[in-house]
Amino acid sequence: MSDVRVIIQRDSEREERVVTTGTTAADLFPGERTVVAARVGGELKDLAYEVKDGEEVEPVQISSEDGLNILRHSTAHVMAQAVQELFPEAKLGIGPPVKDGFYYDFDVAKPFTPEDLKAIEKKMQEIQKRGQRFSRRVVTDEAAREELADEPYKLELIGIKGSASNDDGANVEVGSGELTIYDNLDAKTGDLCWKDLCRGPHLPTTRNIPAFKLMRNAAAYWRGSEKNPMLQRIYGTAWPSKDELKAHLDFLAEAEKRDHRKLGNELDLFSIPDQIGSGLAVFHPKGGIVRRVMEDYSRRRHEEEGYEFVYTPHATKGKLFETSGHLDWYADGMYPPMQLDEGVDYYLKPMNCPMHNLIFDARGRSYRELPLRLFEFGTVYRYEKSGVVHGLTRARGFTQDDAHIYCTREKMADELDKTLTFVLNLLRDYGLTDFYLELSTKDPEKFVGSDEVWEEATETLRQVAEKQGLPLVPDPGGAAFYGPKISVQAKDAIGRTWQMSTVQLDFNLPERFDLEYTGPDGSKQRPVMIHRALFGSIERFFAVLLEHYAGAFPAWLAPVQAVGIPIGDAHVEYLQKFAAEAKKKGLRVEVDSSSDRMQKKIRNAQKQKVPFMVIAGDEDMTAGAVSFRYRDGSQENGIPLDEAIAKIAKVVEERTQV
């Protein structure tokens, strides 16, 4: 046997090793049970891959991003095998790994039931214990079609080899190169147990799957298109250990408690009636209070920062979106046109920026007016497929806190710095404090403007972001075609990351709208345009805060800041007078004068997550005082009336949590 020289790469360490022909990647890492694959020359390979002379080989740990994807993809195969053993008529769709888990689509006569999922999970456990070996083999297109003749969706994937999309998961099955099938082989006999069209890589055996659980099933269109058949999708999750699986399930349970759709109903904040339509919310009185307070505070802070408020209509002639380019770039996200005025197309607006450009262009502008900061709570409408609409976080009609800033090239860096600082400070005011920034840069295949302008703008954004002292994560190629952007990513109380604010440079719209201002020398010059959405949308930010606080808003945002709870009927009037005085100070106070017993009233207030429960009995009336009960059950007694009102007002004014 001839010698083979390979380089073992581990982080920054490189080790040259001489092995014999036929050595596999697994042979390079004996006893390392957490290694599930290898990266060879930058490509992921199974551990069964035979290394070649001169190759660089890096172990892939199961806990790494690639390792988790391999674990979850292999578990998806086990699930598909289990489904076809239990439901032989089931036809296979696609089964990719996704964030924190995996799914597989099936064409079956009836939707899966909860009992079916339990049976499938039990069968998966049996397959896992069998230790079946994942074995890769290369096949021709013709051979693949012959082997998979009974799988119509696999045949379709073979036909699109080379153009498979990452968006619909097809690229996990077929790529631009050779076709491969993965066989699940019996650990003892080597007999074929099951097979699937797949690019891989996979775990060595099913025994390498430490912990998994099936989560739910849902309907899904084949490859995400409503024109295609409806399939049944089963979601699952898989982790490197049982402890990590348990931690994930605990996290999901906590997230479910905080689900804004659930809390919105329990706290009577908003609803999404079927009679109106998916993705179109109505805010109830209590939710309306929270939203108004959010908007009022934002409006005040914007005024302090020199923004000017504007209002624009909800619909416009289609010609405006031809000028802006939205009909070229964004038509699929817009609602269909309405033909009015003798056949003129009108559209519901998906964005506010074209109308703000018309405001800028309504008269001549001088450099002395710049920066011009236009701001609007502008309601927009975007067509989202029903499968992606999700409560308030992915809606079809929503209100953006939308600003567009027009400034000179010389003032661009200063304005970006001020804008980002303002954005972060305002988010902190609402209680979000854990951030990192993401810098989205040019997609070399899709951009307008010169390379020089992009480089200057990107470097300016980078410097502005670095000044904040926050982690800066690159997003290569992630920018829109019209300019680079900074995204503010915020973590909530349970560690989830939400994209909040964006600060986006735009080289496209000033050109399309021929926007100009008169410079100091009298010449006409093109302004720099900055898009800035701080909340993203009011509805989405409302949902994020609702989940962040688990419905227990700080007093300044709470729809009811204090509720009076009389110990008996004789104390109702006393608390009503207290409430009247508190309302004069601008506080939102109610008195529970129902016939419920006091303990029931306290439970009701706790369920509604009211910050202050103000309790009064005979002793309180005699002393001219009240008692405070807080959300955590603690209590403070004998607080004089004026002091009690002042204390609530102070907590509201300082925007602190109690």
From Swiss-Prot:
InterPro entries recorded: aa-tRNA-synt_IIb, aa-tRNA-synth_II, aa-tRNA-synth_II/BPL/LPL, Anticodon-bd, Anticodon-bd_dom_sf, TGS, Thr-tRNA-ligase_IIa, Thr/Ala-tRNA-synth_IIc_edit
Requisite cofactors: Zn(2+)
Compartment(s): Cytoplasm
Main location, first listed in the record: cytoplasm
Region (Catalytic): 259-554
Residues reported to bind Zn(2+): 353, 404, 531
Its EC number(s): 6.1.1.3
Any single biological process term in GO: threonyl-tRNA aminoacylation
Any one Gene Ontology molecular-function term assigned to this protein's record: threonine-tRNA ligase activity
Catalytic activity: tRNA(Thr) + L-threonine + ATP = L-threonyl-tRNA(Thr) + AMP + diphosphate + H(+)
Cofactor annotation remark: Binds 1 zinc ion per subunit.
Keyword Signal: no
UniProt cross-references to Pfam families, sorted A to Z: HGTP_anticodon, tRNA-synt_2b, tRNA_SAD
All residue ranges annotated as the TGS domain in the record: 1-61
Record's keyword annotation contains Cytoplasm: yes
Any Gene Ontology CC annotation: cytoplasm
Keywords of the record: Aminoacyl-tRNA synthetase, ATP-binding, Cytoplasm, Ligase, Metal-binding, Nucleotide-binding, Protein biosynthesis, RNA-binding, tRNA-binding, Zinc
Subunit structure: Homodimer.
Role of this protein: Catalyzes the attachment of threonine to tRNA(Thr) in a two-step reaction: L-threonine is first activated by ATP to form Thr-AMP and then transferred to the acceptor end of tRNA(Thr). Also edits incorrectly charged L-seryl-tRNA(Thr).
Family of the protein in this entry: Belongs to the class-II aminoacyl-tRNA synthetase family.
Classification via NCBIfam families: thrS
Protein name as catalogued: Threonine--tRNA ligase
